[in-house]
Amino acid sequence: MARKSKLPLLLVPLLLCQALVRCSSPLPLVLNTWPFKNATEAAWRALASGGSALDAVESGCAMCETEQCGGSVGFGGSPDELGETTLDAMIMEGTTMDVGAVGDLRRIKNAIGVARKVLEHTTHTLLVGESATKFAESMGFVNEDLSTSASQALHSDWLARNCQPNYWRNVVPDPSKYCGPYKPLGILKQDIPIHKETEDNRGHDTIGMVVIHKTGRIAAGTSTNGIKFKIHGRVGDSPVPGAGAYADDTAGAAAATGEGDILMRFLPSYQAVEYMRGGEDPTIACQKVISRIQKYFPEFFGAVICANVTGSYGAACNKLSTFTQFSFMVYNSEKNQPTEEKVDCI
């Protein structure tokens, strides 16, 4: 009896590709939150010039820091309640799982650059505050004022509006009517109203970026100046691995943007990557993450971008009356330019 020929399993996809003629991979891939086109281009240029996925993430986020994307990245934006602009950033390498991050970074413009120095020159993951600034100076970064006339004007206007909105609660004087300094609300003073956050959804436009190199190596990163009028010393989700962004060469990568104080409680980027590891499509993975948060905070402002190891990507956002679509940027080998795409919120 004649023996049946058995083709190696790995050869079958190749033959199928040849039969279909077109078999190009979508890699490399650059994916980032919001329509920050120049950041996407900067990351792609880094790849085109022979750079790594990590190089591309750093270049893309650095471009946004320089251009002050949306007023919510880089210097001169989102003054805290003392009028100071501080920065958060993170960069993660999905092959080694190495991470470098900075939070509440002061007087240093290139936050993503400092984050990479943390990754490359320390065994730590996150440095914060004045100590992060001292580290940056030791790495050669220039100490300079991050405030601008625009950020100073924002702060002055906020003070004139009795410090509204702010992020205090259960304190006296009533934070919904007055500026601080505040003290804890005593047990016998519960008749004083508890302040609720009233800030609109603008100003949360963190750049989150995912890059997959043509070799399959993955990196992700974030950069932001946080939320306007935050309490001095506040650190958001952006520099927290698994919250702001997450990368793993064996599964994919994700990045989040929005209300960091809520997002970080759910580690959305990590969770999205784990969904993709389990076989979920990137869009479904992003949607599942948003749905998990909706159960507890139905009115939260946030979005997530996701990409798996094949270069397939997706995004999702939480639908609000003032936020029904989320825009993000894509650049891969099948496109000849950075392309803005939109997804309807759920």
Curated annotation (Swiss-Prot):
Q: Where is the active site?
A: T206
Q: Give the SUPFAM superfamilies listed for this entry.
A: N-terminal nucleophile aminohydrolases (Ntn hydrolases)
- What does the UniProt entry say about where the protein is found? Lysosome
Record's family?
Belongs to the Ntn-hydrolase family.
Catalytic activity from the UniProt record: N(4)-(beta-N-acetyl-D-glucosaminyl)-L-asparagine + H2O = N-acetyl-beta-D-glucosaminylamine + L-aspartate + H(+)
Chief localisation class:
other
The record describes its post-translational modification as: Cleaved into an alpha and beta chain by autocatalysis; this activates the enzyme. The N-terminal residue of the beta subunit is responsible for the nucleophile hydrolase activity.
Identify the stretch annotated as signal peptide in this record.
Answer: 1-23
One GO CC term of this entry? lysosome
| Gene Ontology BP annotations | proteolysis
What's the superkingdom here? Eukaryota
Full protein name = N(4)-(beta-N-acetylglucosaminyl)-L-asparaginase
What the entry lists under Pfam families is as follows: Asparaginase_2
Residues binding substrate, per UniProt: R234, V235, G236, D237, T257, G258, E259, G260
GO MF terms held by the record = N4-(beta-N-acetylglucosaminyl)-L-asparaginase activity; peptidase activity
Cystine pairs annotated here are: C64-C69, C163-C179, C286-C306, C317-C345
Q: Oligomeric state and partners?
A: Heterotetramer of two alpha and two beta chains arranged as a dimer of alpha/beta heterodimers.
Residues with glycosylation annotation: N38, N308
